[in-house]
Amino acid sequence: MLAFNFFGATEGGLFDINATLPLMAIQVVALTYILNSLFFKPVGNVVEKREKFVSNNIIEAKNKLSEVKKLEAELLTQLQSARTEAQRIVGEAENESDKLYKEALELANNEANASKEKARLEIESQTSAARDQLSKQADDLSELIVNRLILEK
């Protein structure tokens, strides 16, 4: 007891070692058990559920992100393929258009040349007919002149 008095503690103080100490220890253990079973475990369960929910959402988000990246890559490939196909189709259409234009131009030139040749042949025919007619008229006129000259003599 001298030791307790030396530190200024008196009997009936805060840390008296007597029969109430084991009772207090039992109360602390009982309170810890009650708090653990009524408060800490349910809160822990809620926290664990929330952690599982968050981790599942993160995993799901990562999976969806990887799926989106795959789809994006696939769509970019399809887009590039579509662009290439469109360029090929446009090129083919331009070639076909040029071919049709050249064919139409050649046909028009052939028709123009045929019309020109027909007109030339017609002109030659008419020229030949006119020459023949002039020749015949010249022959008739010369015969007429000869006949008049013969009659006058």
Curated annotation (Swiss-Prot):
The gene is atpF2. One of its GO terms (cellular component) is proton-transporting ATP synthase complex. F(1)F(0) ATP synthase produces ATP from ADP in the presence of a proton or sodium gradient. F-type ATPases consist of two structural domains, F(1) containing the extramembraneous catalytic core and F(0) containing the membrane proton channel, linked together by a central stalk and a peripheral stalk. During catalysis, ATP synthesis in the catalytic domain of F(1) is coupled via a rotary mechanism of the central stalk subunits to proton translocation. Component of the F(0) channel, it forms part of the peripheral stalk, linking F(1) to F(0). The b'-subunit is a diverged and duplicated form of b found in plants and photosynthetic bacteria. HAMAP family: ATP_synth_b_bprime, ATP_synth_bprime. It is found in: Cellular thylakoid membrane. The chain crosses the membrane at residues 23-40. PANTHER family: ATP SYNTHASE SUBUNIT B', CHLOROPLASTIC (PTHR33445:SF2). Keywords: ATP synthesis, CF(0), Hydrogen ion transport, Ion transport, Membrane, Thylakoid, Transmembrane, Transmembrane helix, Transport. F-type ATPases have 2 components, F(1) - the catalytic core - and F(0) - the membrane proton channel. F(1) has five subunits: alpha(3), beta(3), gamma(1), delta(1), epsilon(1). F(0) has four main subunits: a(1), b(1), b'(1) and c(10-14). The alpha and beta chains form an alternating ring which encloses part of the gamma chain. F(1) is attached to F(0) by a central stalk formed by the gamma and epsilon chains, while a peripheral stalk is formed by the delta, b and b' chains. It is a single-pass membrane protein. This is ATP synthase subunit b'. The lineage of its organism: Bacteria, Bacillati, Cyanobacteriota, Cyanophyceae, Synechococcales. It holds the Pfam family ATP-synt_B. SUPFAM superfamilies: F1F0 ATP synthase subunit B, membrane domain. GO terms for molecular function: proton-transporting ATP synthase activity, rotational mechanism; proton-transporting ATPase activity, rotational mechanism. Belongs to the ATPase B chain family. It comes from Prochlorococcus marinus (strain MIT 9312).
